[in-house]
């Protein structure tokens, strides 16, 4: 008789990672879902039902938010919320803040940094080293969005599959697989969550192209969607951690218990490099009225 291993799955994607000018304060977002295999499958089925009912074939993406799919996107977010609150599903988001400036190594490319961040994200964000010990062992299948760089794909897979050793958890096996987010509604919902955070945090609704007055219809729509997602996350946080205040752009505490890295339903992590300089130029008081960067102000 085959022993039943405790099976978990992680889905993760990244957004706002490319340094397209002008730069934004909050960038390098990583968003992911963790859950037991059966609950992740249940979430997938529920999201797919919504997709079929709305009959919208276009990929779910923050950049695709429109009047036509607004209700569809909100339903997907509601569905994720329901599964987080009622089943074994968790959401994790990590990002960087340019107010904490890291001087890159001379030969370090953007992809190198992205690779290192992905590693940190999977290693620390889901608290997998705190997975309850199962007599039959545990397996974690990590599904990442198919990456552009083959060099980093293989390296990242090797690094991540060695994590149970780093965690001193020989009872855990971890496997990494890559999938195309265009075919994965779960990864697409992560894109919505990250897109909303980046839009809201970087105050895109304040931008006024060519000195126009007021928001464009697209800005109004995106702000409405971002606020909807913000309220959803805030509600989950209040329900599951009993927290009164919620900040989308600060790290979630662990209340003195490191197992909460795994136990919490929702966690946010502002990744601050151990070696950094404070750049006050990126703090809200020093941005212009449209939320744009003006100049460096290193402490």
Residue ranges and their predicted role:
Residues 1-299:
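Phosphate-ester processing/binding pockets and catalytic centers
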């Amino acid at each position: 008789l085959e022993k039943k291993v405790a099976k978990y799955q992680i889905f993760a994607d990244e957004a706002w990672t490319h340094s397209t000018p002008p730069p934004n304060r909050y960038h390098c977002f990583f968003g992911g879902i963790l859950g037991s295999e059966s609950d992740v499958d249940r979430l997938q089925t529920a999201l797919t039902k919504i997709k079929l009912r709305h009959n919208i074939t276009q990929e779910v993406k923050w950049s695709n938010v429109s009047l036509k799919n607004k209700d569809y996107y909100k339903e997907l977010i509601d569905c994720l919320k329901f599964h987080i609150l009622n089943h074994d599903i968790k959401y994790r988001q990590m990002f960087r803040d340019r107010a904490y400036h890291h001087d890159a190594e001379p030969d370090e490319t953007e992809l190198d940094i992205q690779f290192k961040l992905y590693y940190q994200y999977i290693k620390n964000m889901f608290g997998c080293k705190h997975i309850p010990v199962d007599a039959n062992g545990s397996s974690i299948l990590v599904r990442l969005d198919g990456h552009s760089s083959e060099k980093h794909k293989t390296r990242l897979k090797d690094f991540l599959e060695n994590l149970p050793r780093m965690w001193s958890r020989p009872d855990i096996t971890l496997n990494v697989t890559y999938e195309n987010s265009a075919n994965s509604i779960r990864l697409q919902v992560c894109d919505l969550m990250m897109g909303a955070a980046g839009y809201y945090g970087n105050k895109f609704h304040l931008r006024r192209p060519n000195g126009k007055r007021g928001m464009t219809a697209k800005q109004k729509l995106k702000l409405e969607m971002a606020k909807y997602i913000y309220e959803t996350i805030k509600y989950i946080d209040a329900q599951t951690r009993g927290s009164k205040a919620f900040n989308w752009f600060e790290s979630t505490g662990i209340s003195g218990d490191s197992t909460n890295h795994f136990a919490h339903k929702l966690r946010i992590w502002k990744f601050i490099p151990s070696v950094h300089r404070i750049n006050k130029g990126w703090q809200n008081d020093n941005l212009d009225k449209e939320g744009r960067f003006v100049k460096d102000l290193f402490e």
